[in-house]
UniProtKB/Swiss-Prot annotation:
The keyword Lipid biosynthesis applies. One of its GO terms (molecular function) is NAD binding. It comes from the Bacteria. Its main location: cytoplasm. Sn-glycerol 3-phosphate binds at residues 108, 136, 138, 191, 246, 256-258. Pfam families: NAD_Gly3P_dh_C, NAD_Gly3P_dh_N. It comes from Ehrlichia ruminantium (strain Gardel). This is Glycerol-3-phosphate dehydrogenase [NAD(P)+]. The active site is at residue 191. Its EC number is 1.1.1.94. InterPro entries: 6-PGluconate_DH-like_C_sf, 6PGD_dom2, G3P_DH_NAD-dep, G3P_DH_NAD-dep_C, G3P_DH_NAD-dep_N, NAD(P)-bd_dom_sf. It is an enzyme of class 1 (oxidoreductase). NADPH binds at residues 10-11, 31, 108, 140, 257, 281, 283. Belongs to the NAD-dependent glycerol-3-phosphate dehydrogenase family.
Length: 327
């Protein structure tokens, strides 16, 4: 069995390690030719996860043609949401190589230009490929260390989804199926912004009670947007790994880049400097603008998210933002 992964960052590399450890041949694609050469030569991704060994059944390449073929059981996309449209367009131009191959998308967030979630972007472009979302509480380093996580595969085709789970689920990647593809992505997008808020509260030493308050209110904001976008709610999604599980993980540890980013803000670091240094790594900073635009379009209020938006982009004071978050 062969699986290709588009995106040789931390998460793509970790997924490759977890799959290859269970006998699956993995093609790992990335743009950085030098880093790709290092992976194949030294069996380590020196740019991301440099301390972890990559088994010999992982082949890295910067040539996208090498990873797009009908022999793939599936193709996993781990690129940032703002780059997803470009990658999907590249795939679409080579549709003859991978027509009908399932696409499993790990991107989290909302596209700035269209206000679309990752699955909506992919479905618009890749009309001949089954689209699934793979999401849940899953730090890359823990996956690379073969520590277990519970994640969700969401998509419309239950039979195909469950068949894929049988093939790729293992003792590290414990995967469950959901049909609620939009609900899963709403939780994945908002949790990063809520984690920034939790980091700010922790950085200001306002206590665990206040952090718990933010998580609780944040869960309500996920529910609010979920109902407005989906016109219904699936409780299994809301309290499952992709919403509640990912929210708890992202909001309660400094290993979360979004929580750590908020922590530095709470400690008084300059916000613009932090954004400049972390823009590509902290998903919440690129999600908050399109999220607020989407909330306005759907006529819903998200107090925590608008507070973070105003803090990052409208220059309100930190104390005012904290007051709004906790009010």
């Amino acid at each position: 069995m062969k699986i290709s992964i588009l995106g040789a960052g931390s998460f793509g590399t970790a997924i490759a390690i977890a799959l290859s450890a269970h006998g699956i041949s993995v093609n790992l694609w990335g743009r950085d030719h030098r880093n790709i050469t290092h992976i194949n030569t030294y069996r380590k991704n020196l740019k991301y996860l440099p301390t972890y060994h990559l088994p010999d059944n992982i082949y890295a390449t910067s040539n996208i043609d090498e990873v797009l073929s009908d022999n793939n059981t599936c193709i996993i996309l781990t690129v940032p949401t703002q780059q997803l449209r470009t990658i999907c367009t590249q795939i679409q131009h080579k549709q003859h190589m991978c027509k009908n191959t399932p696409m499993l998308i790990c991107s989290k967030g909302i596209e700035i230009t269209s206000l679309k979630f990752p699955s909506e972007i992919a479905e618009e472009i890749l009309q001949y490929n089954p689209i699934f979302i793979l999401s849940g509480p899953s730090f890359a380093k823990e996956i690379a260390e073969h520590l277990p996580c519970s994640i969700v595969l969401a998509g419309d085709n239950k039979e195909l989804g469950e068949s894929l789970i049988e093939k790729i689920s293992n003792d590290v990647l414990k995967i469950i199926y959901h049909q609620d593809i939009i609900g899963v992505q709403i939780g994945a997008a908002l949790k990063n912004i809520i984690a920034i808020a939790c980091g700010i509260i922790a950085g200001k030493n306002l206590g665990n009670n206040a952090v718990a308050t933010v998580i609780t209110k944040g869960m309500n904001e996920i529910k609010t947007l979920y109902i407005a976008k989906n016109h219904s709610i699936d409780l299994h999604t809301l309290i499952g790994p992709s919403c509640l599980g990912d929210l708890i993980l992202t909001c309660t540890t400094e290993h979360s880049r979004n929580m750590a980013f908020g922590l530095e803000i709470g400690k008084g670091r300059n916000i613009n400097t932090l954004i400049d240094h972390n823009l590509k790594l902290v998903e919440g900073t690129s999600t908050v603008k399109p999220l607020i635009s989407l909330a306005k379009k759907l006529n819903v209020e998200l107090p925590i998210c608008i507070s973070i938006y105003n803090l990052l982009h409208e220059n309100i004071s930190l104390d005012k933002a904290i007051s709004n978050i906790l009010s």
